[in-house]
Amino acid sequence: MAQFFKPQKRNKSVSKTLKAQVSALDHQARAVIRGEGSKKQTRFIMGALPGEVIQYKTTGKHSGTLERILEPSADRRDAPCKYYDQCGGCDFQHVAESYQLGHKQQVVEELFQKFGVFDSATESLPWQAPLVSEPTRYRRRVRLATRWLGKEQKLLIGFREAQSHQIVAVDDCLVADESLLQAVNRLYPVLNTSSIATKLGHLEAIHTNKPVILLRITDSLPKDALQALGSWQAEHNIDIWLQSENELTPLNNAGLPFDTSIDGDKLYFQPGDFLQVNGGINERMVQQAIDWLAPEKTQRVYDFFAGIGNFSIPLARRSKSVLAVEGVYRMAKQTLSNAEANGLNNLTSLSADLNDISASDLKNPADLWCLDPARPGAEGVMTLLKKLKPEQRPSRIVYVSCAPDTLARDLAIIAGLKSDKKSSDYRITKLCTVDMFPQTHHIETMVCLERAS
């Protein structure tokens, strides 16, 4: 017999305005509010600091938005960017850079403790001095959102608000190289037409050896639009590339290959390839990886998540051989091309799924490993390492991470208090934070591990 059910009405959460004192910051630089009301909810609110008394509005079970600072912290400063209160890009400008660095190191330490990488009651971590960046104008690549306002016949270009699809229109960005937004502003009159703007998803501006603007196109552009873009490109000497769902093409065969210098070598790339946003700090990070790994001409190196050869090329110049392993086939090919362009014949490039890599994918055991994964981390590589026979394991590893939670998870596999010491006996010998993303909560970390004797 058929049965009919009437869906129950959902209880709508009622937004409330409350007052509380901030107890701490979490690893995303959100203020932690504890013990609110009879249910003792914990809430997370962006923009406040430990010790501050704030007024905020509840927006969900564990979230809220900051309305007023009633009792400010002595660590608070006025944000230097005029768009800070609206833009969702930077989220940590309300404290000095020294505070940002201290907080980030504390986050790494707390996550290592949580995941069992070390026990703060019985040992300390071998922290080295952080690699410090210029606090502003450090980005050589920015991605901007776009939206065509049909009624106003106007194109919005800017960054999205925090946790929102709304766009904050900007004419400058304090953390970006000045040339990037200047190029976008000059191109704006050409983009601000319905024939282009209605087919524009987002745009990216990059500047290494020369500027380039990448337009993400959702549909084919008409002939007159392509002609207008081509004329602008020729007049301003700024290359334009068009990216559709399955294709990346230069407009009118624009320009020579783009390159960035690292350790005296040139790395060629295409717009759309992964490129560290902070060129200055990247050079220092690569040099520190070389110093920590200390490769010799008799040693083999594995470079996992190799990209276009950021670490592989400098390491190949100092070692017997390098196997560069990269998940994206196009970039794996580019790494090999970059090695050849720099006169290196001791680098092999392999495109492989790094989440499911096995010993059969690797040929000769390597003495040194370098890892630079994206935010999901390198769990597959760490699991492989744990399974290898002792004679197949590297003597030294440098792990570069942009996500401290997955870093802690991965290190716990091979170096944690609960790891199988018979199969994976590594200890942390050096670590530091890398100031890749000043004015934001994002944390870059470098860790050096060595096999215990």
Report each predicted region and the residues it spans:
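Short, solvent-exposed loop/turn segments that connect beta-strands within catalytic domains
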Residues: 38-39, 149-155, 393, 420-424
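Residue-level recognition of conserved beta-strand edge/terminus positions
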Residues: 57-59, 145, 450
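Extended interfacial segments that mediate partner engagement and assembly in macromolecular machines
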Residues: 67-78, 86-200
